Amino acid sequence: MRVITWNCGGGLRKKLDIIESFKADILVIQEAEDPALSTIAYRDWASNYLWVGTNKNKGIGVFSKYPLRSLNWNAEYSIAGIAHSKAKWKTSDLETFLPFECNGQVYLAVWTKSGGTDSAFSYIGQFWKFLQLHKADIKRNDCIILGDFNSNVRWDKHDAWWRHTEVVEELEQLKFGSLYHHQFNEAQGVESEPTFFHQYNLNKAYHIDYVFMPNHLLGT
């Protein structure tokens, strides 16, 4: 199976030739339009898809020639000993995640966002919260986690416990690792291959997209 994740930056309907050239079996696309509310040509191309988002122009789209099944992962979590509204959350509070199954394999499509009013837990904080809710689901299903995390260990804040470093450590405790870092034998934060160029500027290169999978799938 060839699986590709890509933040298309919007306007996927205008970039179909690009993505088709990779001949993927599964496409996980961030900032994709909702095919149901877009052009007929785009809807016909999508045909078999899943989509979630709060803006019809930019959400997570999953496209495949194989049957797709959305998974209804819902849970609530609270941090013990902290009496604050921000210390309790549920799956639907977080953006943006789409668990799905294809050909017997479970995937979690990721596009972390600013968190709206929950700005303290923006981007990687959104995934950290999701991880607290769904560790058992991820572990039990040998889930492949992939997408745009908008995060890198270089941006860790010293006063947060939901930093990129802690997320990677929690995944390692579940016996999950990063596909890129395994293949390239590089440490987090010193990636030689960027996945994003801010404002399309080659001098603003960052590595913010990841695939995490069980160690036994990595061959470790």
What name fits each language-model region?
Residues A32-K113:
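Structured beta-strand-rich core segments of catalytic domains in phosphoester-bond hydrolases
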Residues V3-G10, S85-K88, A120-I124:
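Short, flexible loop segments at the rims of nucleotide/cofactor-binding pockets, characterized by
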Residues L12-K14, P35-S38, G59, L71, ...:
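Short catalytic/ligand-binding loop motif for oxyanion handling, primarily in non-cytosolic enzymes
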Residues G125-I208:
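Metal-dependent phosphoesterases centered on the DNase I-like endonuclease/exonuclease/phosphatase
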Residues V3-N7, I18-S38, Y107, F130-K157, ...:
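Active-site beta-strand/loop signature of hydrolases that rely on acidic residues for catalysis
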Residues Y107-S122, E169-E172:
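Active-site-proximal loop/helix segment associated with metal-binding centers of metalloenzymes
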Residues K56-W73, E191, H198-G219:
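Conserved beta strand-loop-helix elements of the APE1-like EEP
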Residues A32, F184, H216:
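Flexible loop residues that form catalytic
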